[in-house]
Structure formats: structure tokens, C-alpha cells
């Protein structure tokens, strides 16, 4: 996904614009959205509605975490949202160990959630 596509999606989902983010936050959100979209593609063909339903939770968490609006531990009861927030954390420069500690989950769980992004 490119930045313009992500800005439109974030605008449609959350009524936010590019001006609501710093350049760093926007870069993290764009990278996270691209990764989340790739992961959803592995579920096979789906309608736009189905895709939007599956994107909403992880994207909300990625935006909230990237902007510092919510701590990672807030998402531990919802694996999809935790995954979105942790993906944003990786693109913000944090390690898997840092994210696991922040979320209060085991390193093994954080590694499983992050998959190929694990480091």
C-alpha cells in the first residue's frame, strides 16, 4: 500500500487526515498497513466488506499504538489488535523482546504473532 491509499483508509475508518500524524507516525502506519494487508491476503479472496471488517481492528490498534494513544498492553485480550499494534511497534524500531515486555506476553507469543518480522 502506498501512503495515499493508507491515508484514505485511515480517513474512511477513523475520520483522520494526514495532518493528524507526524511524518514518522505516518510512515509507521503505512508500513504496518502494508504488512497487515499482506497477512490478510493469505486468507484468500474476500469481498471488500470482509476485508474491511478484518482490517479494522488491527489498523485501529496500529494507529493508536503508533500515535502513542494506547499502550501495547491494552491489546492483549484481542490477538488481531495485538498483532496490528506489534507490527506498528516493529516498524517504529522496537525489538520483539521490547514489545513482548510492553505487552506483558511471553517472547514466544510475541515471536509467533510477528512471524517473519520477529527480531
Spans of features found by a protein language model:
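General nucleic-acid-binding
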Residues: 1-61
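Intrinsic-disorder/low-complexity linker and hinge segments
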Residues: 41-48, 73-76, 80-81
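Short, Lys/Arg-enriched N-terminal segment that forms or immediately precedes the first helix
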Residues: 59-75
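Short, solvent-exposed alpha-helical "recognition" segments
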Residues: 77-80, 111-119
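Short alpha-helical "recognition helix" segments of helix-turn-helix
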Residues: 99-100
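Key DNA-contact positions within bacterial/archaeal DNA-binding proteins
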Residues: 108
Amino acid at each position: 500500500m502506498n501512503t495515499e491509499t493508507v491515508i484514505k483508509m485511515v480517513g474512511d475508518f477513523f475520520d483522520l487526515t494526514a495532518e493528524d500524524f507526524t511524518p514518522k507516525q505516518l510512515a509507521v502506519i503505512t508500513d504496518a498497513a502494508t504488512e497487515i494487508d499482506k497477512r490478510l491476503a493469505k486468507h484468500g479472496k474476500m469481498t471488500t466488506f470482509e476485508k474491511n471488517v478484518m482490517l479494522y481492528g488491527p489498523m485501529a490498534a496500529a494507529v493508536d499504538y503508533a500515535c502513542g494513544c494506547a499502550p501495547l498492553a491494552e491489546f492483549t485480550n484481542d490477538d488481531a489488535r495485538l498483532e496490528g499494534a506489534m507490527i506498528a511497534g516493529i516498524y517504529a524500531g522496537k525489538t520483539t523482546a521490547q514489545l513482548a515486555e510492553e505487552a506483558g506476553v511471553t517472547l514466544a507469543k510475541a515471536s509467533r504473532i510477528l512471524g517473519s518480522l520477529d527480531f
